[in-house]
Amino acid sequence: LEAINDPELSGFMIAPSNPYLSVDPILSIDKIKQTIMQSNKPRVAVSPIIGGDSVKGPTAKIMEEMGLEVNVMTIANHYEDLIDGLIIDNTDEEYIQAIESSGIKVKVSNILMNNNDDKTRLAEEAIEFLNELS
């Protein structure tokens, strides 16, 4: 909680992790979620879904089993009350208007990370987007 309240913190980033198995358990800790929600710092997530599928892991399978559509709109809806911005892949541009109409800003990029250069580029773009939302 101390790190979350650090005045030097410029915002919050949710990595493209499984929202159901990785992110939600952290956010289920009331003090963590409340502190993030009460902060005036921007909150951005990177979609774990690209083109209707998860890159790795069971995210898409879990979404299907829950009766959810496997797309970035479902991710936006899941994080709707939490995030200010969502970074989606170029292949999912068709969802920009729907996501933005829900009040979430969208940045479109190549979010598939095949190597360290891709990871660095996406991290830099994510920080830039976070700063734009400040």
For every predicted segment, state its role.
Residues 39-56, 111-113:
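Short, flexible loop segments at boundaries between secondary-structure elements
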Residues 1-6:
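A short, well-structured juxtamembrane/interface segment
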Residues 17-21, 49-51, 92:
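Short glycine-rich anion-binding loops that position phosphate/pyrophosphate groups of nucleotides
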Residues 8-22:
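Short acidic, glycine-rich surface-loop motifs adjacent to enzyme active sites
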Residues 10-13, 42, 85:
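Structural motif
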Residues 25-34:
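Charged helix-capping and loop-helix junction motifs
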Residues 56-134:
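C-terminal functional extensions of proteins
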Residues 34-40, 80:
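Short, conserved loop/helix-junction motifs that constitute active-site signature segments
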